[in-house]
């Protein structure tokens, strides 16, 4: 195969991975999708520093030796931490796995990338919330408003389930089981892994008040618990908007009590 043919083929697969495959078959998390896009963008930037052009862009650009040079470049030229380098490498591996599934001639690239050792990371102590900080944060939403009711339930579920932002965003009505002896919610994680989180009576009461405000009548099992007002009940709330709102509420609670991580 000519190098130019190889270049066109790989470029087409990069676009297909970012625009079609990843958002439809890997994740709905905007953060993860952005991570894939950033990793591939940085890899292309690195290849340009290696004098790679359309004329010599080919499969050899994704071989182990080149990827290892990329990691060094990330550390030395981009000042990336070991943790960030590992995230970038993980994202590139996901693309190379996809590439190998599209054309068996590229499968060896993924197999080589799997052998690259991750960077050693220093374990960091995670700063948690104190009980007072949690109470202060849950007191921020104004429950006299619909938005306040939503924020309270969202924050409560985030805290009591220890779920990720996207797991809470992805809850549908059918994932809630509120009327049994032991009420629970099913959280759908990465690669569609299901995790069950049991709910206390007070949390169940919050959710039922929220349901009456946001899901009139008999809720559709396939509707999102937290949906976009613009997109409707079958469109989940955007991750950036929720993350920004959570930070603002945490900032407000920090003004009232110490113990909130910055």
How would you describe each model-predicted region?
Residues 1-262:
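Conserved catalytic core of the tyrosine transesterase superfamily
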């Amino acid at each position: 195969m000519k190098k130019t043919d190889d270049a066109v083929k790989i470029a087409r697969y990069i676009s297909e991975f970012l625009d079609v495959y990843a958002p439809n078959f890997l994740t709905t998390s905007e953060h993860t999708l952005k991570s894939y896009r950033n990793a591939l963008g940085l890899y292309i930037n690195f290849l340009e520093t290696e004098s790679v052009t359309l004329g010599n862009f080919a499969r050899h650009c994704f071989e182990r030796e080149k990827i290892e040079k990329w990691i060094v470049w990330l550390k030395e030229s981009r000042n990336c931490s070991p943790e960030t380098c590992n995230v970038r490498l993980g994202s590139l591996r996901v693309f190379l796995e996809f590439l190998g599934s599209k054309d068996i001639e590229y499968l060896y690239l993924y197999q080589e990338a799997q052998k690259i050792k991750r960077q050693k990371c220093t374990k960091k102590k995670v700063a948690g919330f104190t009980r007072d900080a949690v109470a202060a944060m849950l007191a921020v939403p104004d429950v006299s408003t619909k938005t306040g009711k939503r924020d309270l339930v969202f924050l409560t579920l985030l805290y009591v389930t220890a779920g990720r932002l996207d797991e809470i965003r992805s809850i549908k009505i059918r994932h809630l089981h509120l009327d049994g002896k032991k009420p629970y919610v099913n959280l759908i994680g990465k690669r569609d892994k299901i995790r069950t989180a049991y709910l206390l009576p007070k949390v169940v009461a919050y959710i039922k008040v929220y349901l009456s405000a946001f899901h009139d009548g008999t809720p559709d099992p396939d509707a999102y618990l937290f949906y976009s007002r613009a997109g409707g009940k079958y469109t989940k709330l955007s991750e950036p908007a929720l993350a920004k709102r959570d930070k603002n509420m945490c900032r407000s609670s920090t003004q009232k009590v110490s113990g909130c991580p910055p």
